Amino acid sequence: MSVWPRWLAAVVFALGFLAATGASAEVRSLKLYHLHTHEKAEIVYKRNGRYDPEGLRKINIILRDWRRNEPTKMDPRLLDLVWEAYRQSGATDYIQVVCGYRSPATNSMLRSRSRGVAEKSQHMLGKA
């Protein structure tokens, strides 16, 4: 048996290890600007493949129901989806937030004023 297959296997292993290490060393952040509160922040919410509790807390505050000053726990999968769209689009500016979380009371109030507000809005679940 020649040395070539062992060498090739070692290279493939090393490249796979480096790729996996690079992915786990990834830092994800979102640049948010809330149009109603005028709050602006760049927040790291994920490091090395794990959600950063302090970053999530900060995002929950900026995406709170601003009418009632009531935060919730936003779904981290939503943040990953927004991050991925932001990255793929090549955007570099702040993401303009119109609405994040809505309390049931706020959703009910908005629903009474507009037919375009869902009764069981994803905003009330921290998913929009």
Residues covered by each model-derived region:
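N-terminal signal peptide c-region/cleavage motif recognized by signal peptidases
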Residues: 20-22
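Bacterial N-terminal signal peptides that target proteins for export
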Residues: 1-9
